[in-house]
């Protein structure tokens, strides 16, 4: 993987990732949003439909694919690309967040994590080394180190111990990745909770080990938005300028804008797909809740500014009808629209950075959705 930083507008960065894959070179324009394909599918969508929304890279879930269908099935198809028939780049998370999500079902030790398989109930063990081996078999283009996602709230001592263990796990991940002679990219993950001092130690420790890119983890786990913005604004300047920066598990459209304002290049979130299935649809001026009875007879498209298949062909009344009847097509059309909304937003962001008018774009974006522009920490401190 090669990263090229092309231009900036304030702290916003316009870049390009290039991946060499068996079917040729693949380019990902950044800032980029990655749809989530937890079980080897973006729910309800074919790979061709996902690509048609403008997505250039997907996220797969190491933990879930390891449990089902397992490494052997994956290897029998070549890798995850062959299994799901997506031939562009794939980033896989390490399983750390899923382990964090299991709560009482897991036990964390220095060696790794023992937990109860949520499918079969048996005890299984996941370590930094095992995570690197699974991701190698998945053929991931971007491999994530195995870490502990520090919960919120966490005391300073808990966050410190968790971050220090994640740093040791980062080194073990790096070593096993190199032993496997994996030709792909490996990203480190900054932890440290909401404590700037710990974030600094984590970022510096990861840079010392050396990675192809750096993620900011442990955010969007329940902390107030202001806290997320503060930690993000503090952390990104600590990361190398010439490497991509990834904000994990974020988020709402305004979260993407705020991440880019603070120097982030990559995002992923289940929000556009999950919200689509629940009738929450993102449009240029906010959100349409398609289950509202006022749309029952609405003959207008979802978003007149949108060029997706759904908006070009169907009315709100039809989408309301499909949702009311529980038709699968409704969820699919909603998903197509929400994913396209996110990709259009990223394209608009990239263009604004190229034209060095990103600050103006931010003002216009918030004006459209009827919200105030959140201040940057640097502005608050003046």
UniProtKB/Swiss-Prot annotation:
One of its GO terms (cellular component) is cytosol. Keywords: Glycosyltransferase, Metal-binding, Queuosine biosynthesis, Transferase, tRNA processing, Zinc. Zn(2+) binds at residues 306, 308, 311, 337. Residues 249-255, 273-277 are annotated as: RNA binding. GO terms for biological process: queuosine biosynthetic process; tRNA wobble guanine modification; tRNA-guanine transglycosylation. Its cofactor is Zn(2+). Substrate binds at residues 93-97, 147, 191, 218. Its EC number is 2.4.2.29. Pathway: tRNA modification; tRNA-queuosine biosynthesis. The keyword Transferase applies. Catalyzes the base-exchange of a guanine (G) residue with the queuine precursor 7-aminomethyl-7-deazaguanine (PreQ1) at position 34 (anticodon wobble position) in tRNAs with GU(N) anticodons (tRNA-Asp, -Asn, -His and -Tyr). Catalysis occurs through a double-displacement mechanism. The nucleophile active site attacks the C1' of nucleotide 34 to detach the guanine base from the RNA, forming a covalent enzyme-RNA intermediate. The proton acceptor active site deprotonates the incoming PreQ1, allowing a nucleophilic attack on the C1' of the ribose to form the product. Belongs to the queuine tRNA-ribosyltransferase family. This is Queuine tRNA-ribosyltransferase. It comes from Actinobacillus pleuropneumoniae serotype 3 (strain JL03).
């Amino acid at each position: 993987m090669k990263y090229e930083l092309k231009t900036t507008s304030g702290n916003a960065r316009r870049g390009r990732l290039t991946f060499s894959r068996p079917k040729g070179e693949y380019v990902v324009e950044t800032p980029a949003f990655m749809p989530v394909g937890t079980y080897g599918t973006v729910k309800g969508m074919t790979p061709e439909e996902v690509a048609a929304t403008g997505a250039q890279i997907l996220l797969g879930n190491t933990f879930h694919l390891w449990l089902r269908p397992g490494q052997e099935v994956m290897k029998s198809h070549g890798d995850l690309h062959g299994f799901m028939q997506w031939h562009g780049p794939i980033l896989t998370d390490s399983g750390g967040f899923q382990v964090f999500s299991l709560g009482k079902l897991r036990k964390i030790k220095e060696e790794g994590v023992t937990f109860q398989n949520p499918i079969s109930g048996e005890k299984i063990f996941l370590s930094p080394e095992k995570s690197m081996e699974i991701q190698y078999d998945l053929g991931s283009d971007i491999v994530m180190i195995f870490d502990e996602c520090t919960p919120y709230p966490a005391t300073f001592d808990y966050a410190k111990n968790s971050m220090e263990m994640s740093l040791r796990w980062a080194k073990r991940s790096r070593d096993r990745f190199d032993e496997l002679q994996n030709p792909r990219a490996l990203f480190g993950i900054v932890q440290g909770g909401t404590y700037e001092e710990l974030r600094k130690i984590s970022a510096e420790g990861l840079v010392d080990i050396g990675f192809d890119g750096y993620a900011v983890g442990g955010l969007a786990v329940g902390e107030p938005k202001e806290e997320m913005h503060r930690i993000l604004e503090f952390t990104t300047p600590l990361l190398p300028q010439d490497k991509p920066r990834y904000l994990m598990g974020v988020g709402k459209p305004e979260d993407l804008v705020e991440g880019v304002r603070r120097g982030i290049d990559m995002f992923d979130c289940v929000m556009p797909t999950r919200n689509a299935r629940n009738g929450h649809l993102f449009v240029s001026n906010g959100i349409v809740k398609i289950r509202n009875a006022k749309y029952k007879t609405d003959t207008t498209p979802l978003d007149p500014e949108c060029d997706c298949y759904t908006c070009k062909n169907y009315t709100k009344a039809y989408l309301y009808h499909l949702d009311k009847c529980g038709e699968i097509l409704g969820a699919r059309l909603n998903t197509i629209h929400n994913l396209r909304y996110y990709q259009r937003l990223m394209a608009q962001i990239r263009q604004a950075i190229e034209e060095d008018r990103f600050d103006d774009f931010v003002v216009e974006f918030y004006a459209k959705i009827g919200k105030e522009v959140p201040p940057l920490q640097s502005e608050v401190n003046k």
